[in-house]
From Swiss-Prot:
Places the protein is found: Mitochondrion
Xref: Pfam families: Exo5 (PF09810)
Protein's organism: Candida dubliniensis (strain CD36 / ATCC MYA-646 / CBS 7987 / NCPF 3949 / NRRL Y-17841) (Yeast)
Assembly behavior: Monomer.
Gene Ontology CC entries for this record: mitochondrion; nucleus
Name used for this protein in its record: Exonuclease V, mitochondrial
Lineage: Eukaryota, Fungi, Dikarya, Ascomycota, Saccharomycotina
GO molecular function: 4 iron, 4 sulfur cluster binding; DNA binding; metal ion binding; single-stranded DNA 5'-3' DNA exonuclease activity
UniProt KW keywords: 4Fe-4S, DNA-binding, Exonuclease, Hydrolase, Iron, Iron-sulfur, Magnesium, Metal-binding, Mitochondrion, Nuclease, Transit peptide
Binding-site residues, [4Fe-4S] cluster: 160, 582, 585, 591
Family, similarity comment: Belongs to the EXO5 family.
Cofactor: Mg(2+); [4Fe-4S] cluster
InterPro entries: EXOV
Transit peptide, start-end: 1-61
């Protein structure tokens, strides 16, 4: 019988009779009275002011405890083993705590209340699952305010599951950015700009703010309580900009130009059944965890003839024949375009392919099989998310609404005037017609939005005047348009004049969710099973290699189940068998596996954490 089970049997026979031990050692904080320091902090000795060692009478059952005769002999024999275990869990008086080598180690030793002289255990001594801990103790506060996971977080096996496990319980300490990471980010931005050139609205924003502040009658034009509607740029506005750019604009580009980069995707992973939610009624289930990701590159093409462009000829022909232009740019009416585009796509055997781009600082691809497998499954996640979001526009609409609301956003809050004008400038070719509808209080043709959109006055006229011609009674915008045109040459009078009024329906996150969900729905019949991973040299963007895969749902579901069990605490982390990887790990100096310990030694060192876990369960049971 192992030492742990000796302890467990002994503990049950005494703890639940008088519960003397539970009053003293049931609390984790009494087991190890210390705070561990990193190398950046001062060493702190344990003094006599700390809680007493548990090696006195507190660790023994009361002498008046009556136990069954058959247990007395075994209790006596095992008591010394138990005392030794407890003694190993508590620092002696006057002990000096050593410094740990990095913040990640400091974090996990403090959160787990470990003796810094000991190695890290392989067993979670807390009552929190990895996801629960990740959502409560995280250096990135956004994960606490909005509990969620990313696709890359699900790929815990990529390097070493034990490292991923320790990273979670260290408080998800952010590792410093390396030069290779910085170069990789620059390459991603470069590739993105090649397809989606950035439109910088900084000068326009500065002009609008300066002009508004110079209006002598600003407070009459915009009451004080509405100032935030004009100028405020908060989290709602930032999400609106992201949805307009990385959903609506990117999906429209995919329809019109066959390719798009950096598209936002998400799904809801139900930990109970270990699969992604497919029914809108399950989205709000507490066990459904938001999982987000960004797919690097999506292409719509004829797989048997990649040079075939007839589909896009038809779509461009429809746009040119049916919509007016401003500055040689068609003003697309999405209410007419979306159903027609979907019908055109259904007549062609074009399929979507999904690619993730990995940057390399050296001209070679990874040699580790687990790293290559993780990259493959990353593309599988993106492909699966796209399927979930394109199969039913209503589901996608409510999925996006839930996404925003989980982040604490009011989806019916009007966007600021400044945000609206910037969205119009960047995306007037697809938003202008919709904005006219909103201004007039007309439906956009998508029932879930039209049935729930809230009508309210939205003043989109007062601040669009120059101070030298300002008038509340008879607004004059001539000079204002001239000043705007000097900034970037756009024909603002054509795209602004019809909107300069008090709108009946304001632009909101709800509106953007509606159009994004419809754009996803255009691709319902054109989803493909080909995914790939590109490896590029980050300094030159040279393509080093491309690994192509065939999406396999059964294989993907096995990975989803494994990730779910890890994050829900249903299985233990599996350490890497390749110890050469340990030299890159921040936990190496305290990891049993990296130290090459035998199985017997590892098992022995997990006794303490198992006891902590057991005591937590005892505490929960006694409270219940």
């Amino acid at each position: 019988m192992s030492r742990f089970w000796h302890f467990k049997k002994f503990y049950f026979s005494s703890c639940f009779s008088k519960q003397r031990m539970s009053r003293r050692i049931i609390k984790n904080e009494l087991l190890v009275p210390m705070k561990v320091t990193s190398k950046h902090e001062q060493e702190q000795p344990i003094t006599n002011d700390e809680p007493r060692s548990l090696l006195s009478e507190d660790a023994n059952p009361s002498p008046d405890v009556e136990s069954e005769p058959e247990l007395e002999s075994e209790q006596s024999e095992n008591r010394e083993d138990v005392h030794e275990i407890i003694r190993s869990m508590v620092l002696g008086t006057g002990t000096t705590l050593p410094r740990l080598s990095n913040d990640s180690l400091t974090g996990i030793y403090n959160y787990w209340k470990l003796n810094p002289n000991d190695d890290l255990p392989l067993y979670n001594p807390t009552k929190y699952t990895p996801f629960e801990f990740h959502s409560q103790y995280n250096q990135d506060r956004s994960y606490i305010s909005t509990p969620r996971l990313s696709v890359t977080k699900l790929l815990v096996f990529s390097w070493c599951e034990l490292r991923s496990f320790y990273q979670v319980y260290s408080g998800s300490v952010r590792l410093p950015s390396t030069q290779a990471m910085t170069q990789g980010t620059k390459l991603h931005s470069k590739l993105e700009a090649e397809i989606h050139p950035e439109i910088d609205t900084t000068e326009i924003e500065q002009f609008l703010l300066s002009n508004a502040m110079s209006l002598g009658e600003l407070q009459k034009a915009v009451p004080i309580e509405e100032d935030k509607v004009v100028f405020y740029l908060g989290e709602v506005e930032r999400l609106a900009v992201d949805w307009a750019e990385m959903l609506i604009e990117r999906l429209f580009s995919l329809i019109m130009g066959a390719e798009a980069r950096e598209i936002l995707l998400h799904g809801y992973l139900n930990f109970n059944n270990r699969s992604f939610v497919t029914n809108k009624d399950e989205i709000r289930d507490p066990s459904s965890v938001l999982v987000s990701g960004i797919v690097d590159y999506v292409k719509l093409q004829n797989l048997t003839n990649p040079s075939d462009g007839t589909l896009f000829d038809d779509i461009h022909g429809f746009v040119d024949d049916n919509f007016d232009q401003v500055d040689n740019v068609p003003l697309v009416d999405l209410s007419k375009f979306l159903p027609e585009a979907k019908q055109i796509l259904q007549h062609y055997d074009f399929r979507l392919t999904f690619t993730d781009v990995k940057t390399r600082s050296a001209p070679q691809i990874p040699r580790q099989e687990s790293v290559l497998e993780a990259a493959k499954f990353q593309t599988f996640y993106y492909r699966h998310f796209f399927q979930l979001l394109s199969r039913d526009s209503r589901f996608t609409y409510f999925s996006l609404i839930e996404n925003a609301e989980r982040r604490g956003h009011d989806v019916d809050k009007p966007l600021s005037i400044l945000t609206t004008i910037c969205l119009l400038r960047k995306h007037y070719h697809i938003l202008f017609k919709d904005f006219v509808r909103l201004a007039n209080g007309e439906p956009i043709g998508f029932a879930p939005f039209d049935d729930s959109a809230k009508s309210m006055a939205y003043d989109f006229v007062s601040v669009f005047q120059s101070s030298d011609e300002f008038s509340l009674a008879n607004p004059n915008h001539t000079h204002f348009f001239e000043q705007l045109r000097e900034i970037d040459g756009i024909e603002y009078d054509s795209i602004l004049s019809p909107l300069l009024k008090v709108w009946k329906t304001p632009p909101t996150l709800r509106y953007l969710a509606a159009r994004a969900s419809q754009l996803f729905g255009v691709f319902e019949e054109n989803l493909g099973d080909v995914t790939s991973v590109e490896y590029r040299l980050n300094k030159t963007s040279q393509l080093l290699s491309e690994n192509v895969y065939e999406y396999d749902f059964s294989e993907f579901q096995v990975e989803v189940e494994s990730a779910s069990k890890f994050w829900n605490g249903e299985r233990e982390a599996v350490p890497t068998e390749d110890l050469s990887r340990c030299s890159f790990c921040e936990f190496q100096s305290k990891c049993m596996v990296a130290g090459g310990n035998t199985t017997e030694a590892v098992e022995k060192k997990t006794i303490g954490p198992k006891i902590r876990h057991f005591l937590n369960e005892c505490e929960s049971s006694s409270k219940g």
